[in-house]
Amino acid sequence: MKIVKDLEDENNRVAASDPGTVTALGVVRAFLKNHPVMCYGGTAINDLLPKEDQFYDPKVDVPDYDFFSKTPQAHSVIIANQLKAHGIKAVEVKPGMHIGTFKVFADYTGVADITHLDDVIFDRLWKEGEVRNKIHYVPVNFLRMSMYLELSRPRGDVSRWEKVYKRLTLLNEAHPVTCKKDPQTERTELTEQQQKGVIRLLRSEPVVLLGVSSAQIHLNQVWTTPIGLLADGPTIERLTAGEKTEVFEESDILPKRTTVLDSAGKKTLFRFYETTACHSYHKMQNGVKVASIPTALQFFFAYMYSGAHEEKLASVLCIAQRLVEIANAKPERRFAVLTPKECIGTQESFTEMKRDKAELLLELSKNKSSKEYLEYFFTYNPDDKAGKKKVKKQLQTLKETTPEETSRSSK
């Protein structure tokens, strides 16, 4: 209804012009220009689009600043103190819904969401990121990955799909996926007998074809090794039992993965990825389950920031470029529906997330001065004098590296 839209715009315009909100957002923008953080999310997408394509109207919309930081607790304290210094009365830092995210509130309105990102991945993104008006943004391909991730999860918040797809289309038009060349990566074609064996596996087990293998289905190409597969943890353990394997633990952007090697232990035959949500797939007439284009692209773009060799990244980017072209051209797609309802894995519900977080809080609250507690449940209020004295010690605790962490980082 037009009257509803008009009333919403009027209310939003009042909120956007509120002096306190204008001041608070000015403080956040100034912080972004002067600290090593990277914006992502809707505001980042909007800011990287041409003016005529931007979907946020500064007169109507209050920006939602989401950004990555190596030290979100310390950065949230800086913003909170600056907000207080600029006359904002009620300022507070609280843990966000997602573990590792901290929300800064100014007069009870959220003005910044700061999320921790692993140092190694942060540095990779920083190196390839975009800079506009002194503000750093994650690379465009990382933004693409985040949107394909949402579109690949039919058990997630599907109410956002239309908005996400529109933004993705605008971003792809403004910043097309390009690869400098199509390198001839050495891959071995499967024999007819080998392909039949893989098909039997895909038909009889709860496993989905992923990665280059799934792209070859969408692009009608010959199958090659290594075969990429998606399955839950117990299935992967069962199928790889007794095989020569290498296991790579999960990171902030890629799940745990297990590679199956040949008898000599030199060549990778299969690469299993563990499910982290309910990832969409298509079921072919022969019973083979193949990852949807959004699922495949989400993993492709995540792989780009996993530390893989440059020549492998070039090959992956060229495949991703072709998949994006196919996704945007319905007549060329092998499957009419971009994201099907069928999916593999378990999608954690909002209620389950809240329950898990509450259980973690209960456990870590036994020692509120511990590093683990502060990493997940740090809070700060500049009006709390006792808290202000305590925060320096807390931030110092967060800087300290335990022997276990040193051991993990050296592996």
Residue ranges and their predicted role:
Residues 1-23, 132-196, 359, 371-373, ...:
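N-terminal regions immediately upstream of nucleotidyltransferase
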Residues 301-303, 311-344:
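Long, C-terminal catalytic modules of enzymes
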Residues 129-147, 287-307:
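Phosphate-handling catalytic interfaces
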Residues 21-73, 192-238:
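Active-site nucleotide-donor binding segment shared across nucleotidyl transfer reactions
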Residues 81-123, 242-286:
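Conserved catalytic core of two-metal-ion nucleotidyltransferases
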Residues 127-128, 153, 157, 273, ...:
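Short, solvent-exposed beta-strand/turn patches at coil↔beta or beta↔helix junctions
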Residues 178-184, 330-405:
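Eukaryotic intrinsically disordered, low-complexity regulatory regions enriched in Ser/Thr/Pro
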